Amino acid sequence: MRLPIAVGALAAIAAGASAFAQGISDPGERAFQYCFSCHSVEPNQTEVLSGPNLNGVIGRPIASKAGFEYSDAMKSFGAGKVWTPELIAQFIQDPKSMVPGTVMEKPPGPRNPAERAALLDYLKKPR
């Protein structure tokens, strides 16, 4: 009985986020709505969410954002690497396939290459 309720709740949340995102004119910011419940891009965000702050993520060493506790899997995967747009695009399509043992689940979007490109452009913007 709990599973149908949980699935229904998730569907309602996704529908609400989708409706909210439709009012956002920037396609990258709209694509980021898939991410904002776990991540922030605000430079002065002090509250630690369930995912690291993504402000300045492109070009940053993987698993290096101060104040966030990364999984051992992510630390191992990221050793000596930096986030590139290509790596991020690949990672968000299936995090657990790319980094077995990561805590991050597969997000419901961005769903297609155009949305992913818009998201990456959004993440590149200085704040």
Predicted regions mapped to residue ranges:
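Electrostatic cytochrome c docking/interface patches
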Residues: 15-32, 42-50
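C-terminal capping alpha-helices of c-type cytochrome domains
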Residues: 82-127
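Short Fe-S-cluster ligation motifs
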Residues: 64-82
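Short, cysteine/histidine-rich loop/knuckle motifs that typically chelate Zn2+
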Residues: 34-37
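Short cysteine/histidine-rich metal-coordination sites, predominantly Zn2+-binding motifs
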Residues: 51-58
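Bacterial N-terminal signal peptides
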Residues: 7-16
